[in-house]
Amino acid sequence: MLRMNPGLGSSISVHPSELSISLFEILQGKYSYVRGQTLHCSLRNPGVFFRQLFIHLYKNALANCSYDHVLSDWRTYESSAKTRWPEKEAQWGSYRRSTFDSWAQTMRMTLDHLLLNAINRVLYAKTQLSYERYVDWVVTVGMVPVVKHTPDHKLVNSIQEQLMKDCQRLASGEKTIGRILTSVTQEISNLVSSLSALYIPGYSEVSIDYDCVKNTFVGLYKQKRVHVEVITMPAILAGRVIFDSPIQRMYTSIMSCHRTAEHAKLCQLLNTAPTKALVGSACNNVYKDIMTHLEQASQRTDPKRELLNLLMKLAENKTVSGVTDVVEDFVTDVSQNIVDKNKLFGTGQETTTQGLRRQVSNSVFKCLTNQINEQFDTITQLEKERELCMKRLKCIETQLSHQQPGDAKGPGSVNLLTANTFQSLGRLQDPSLQLTSSHIPSGSAVLNSFFSSYIPPVRESMKDLTNLWESEMFQTYKLAPVVDNQGQRLSVTYSQDTISILLGPFTYVIADLLQMELISHSFVSSSLQDIAAYLYQTSRLFVYITDVGQKYCLVTPPFENVPGKGPGETDWSANEYSCPEDSRVRRGLSRIPPPCGAPPCPGSA
């Protein structure tokens, strides 16, 4: 494990952190839940562990029997049958075969009923050890906190009492069944005691720290230190923890897909708005508004109105010729209301109209020059004040952004993906989503206004993320796909490598069930009845029952001298024998080879 050399006695917080909490939230579907993530549901299915417990208990139960008990139970049953069928003694071969078959099959049915009921109590008991939480911890942070406490004696005693009642009720006179139930009751009690003494807490119940001095991970659960089992060692570099887990490796891609989905939702909300308009500065319309107001509220002969009207028209013209035309129109209009001195006092060097035009032109240009200079000074001062205000506003927004996450009374963040569409449209004026205008400097032009209905390719991102989930889960845990005839995947199951990678550490490291064997991959999807049928065919009890049947169901009585044969010999060439036929034997699940040189048993292939 990579790590720096921190100070003496220091520790690094591993969980909870922003990263570790996000990894668990990904499993809960908070960020970009895609179809490929359903593989995790198959991975955390506890059915494989339940089948492993069933195989362990059923196999050990059938192994706890003795040949003497089996033979004693058979002889008791045979004696009881003879008292009920005394006239069948003449048909010696078929009678014995039928009697033994009925005893063997009823023995099997009774054991199946008792053992299945007994083991189901363990499989569905409310033990605190959770295989699902174990898998969640492994695929996120690669380590599992384990809390040890006293066993649940109430649960153990309840199961034990119920099993003893079943044993007394159904197997009071059977030595073999009684011994099997006694052994399985003891094994179940020990197993429930072990499982109920362990607890895997949820990610919100425990904290994990890394002790840099001892190079160990320590958990804290309800103010008590608990053991943390490391399945895959994380990397710790400069106080930063990088987990060695599938979710850690996919974290960047998952969050990128989630942000793309948020972006697409935001674009959808903006494009859903009924109206959109480009709003410009209103200063260009001020002069026209003033003129309209003056025309409506003032008389036409008002000198102030005429002068102000002149100034407004001059401000709208940006060329010298335009200004000249405005001045000439003004002089022509005003000169009609002034008395011509030439008609009263004679002709001079300059007419009244020419003099008035010259005076007005000089006054107007002087006024415009002063006004323009004042406007430039005002604009420069306002730009400086605006820059100062923008800096203060950005500083305040930065302070608010740092204070809002820690403010418990503040409003929660807007989740655009799950919030109501119309409510989200109303929140577009919120500070987090507000569309602000920008100042376009003089001489610049807007090249792209981004007022297009663009929506990010969220479907492609989710499809890529689905493929990434499938590839990561299949390659990391070696899952086996179940496909149909067309090659379409129907489901996934545990392979033998998956059992070794996940179920092995849970069985031997977490649960400490050292006496239990790992399940074979051929049983991971089989029903309990099919597993029980196979285990019975390969059990010690089946071997003992088969041996008793082969010795009892001979047509020629044992140790009887037949001409041409020694004591106890049977004429195998005449097919004068029979063997027990179990229901599974008839279906071809088991084949018991006859003695060397003998023909096969009836009903076998």
UniProtKB/Swiss-Prot annotation:
Residues 592-605 have a biased composition (Pro residues). Keywords: Coiled coil, Host nucleus, Viral genome packaging, Viral release from host cell, Virion. Its main location: virion. The keyword Cell membrane does not apply. One of its GO terms (cellular component) is virion component. Residues 583-605 are annotated as: Disordered. Coiled coil: none annotated. GO terms for biological process: chromosome organization. It is found in: Virion; Host nucleus. It comes from the Viruses. InterPro entries: Herpes_Portal. Signal peptide: none annotated. Homododecamerizes. Interacts with terminase subunits TRM1 and TRM3. Forms a portal in the viral capsid through which viral DNA is translocated during DNA packaging. Assembles as a dodecamer at a single fivefold axe of the T=16 icosahedric capsid. Binds to the molecular motor that translocates the viral DNA, termed terminase. Belongs to the herpesviridae portal protein family. HAMAP family: HSV_PORTL. This is Portal protein. It comes from Human herpesvirus 8 type P (isolate GK18) (HHV-8). The gene is ORF43.
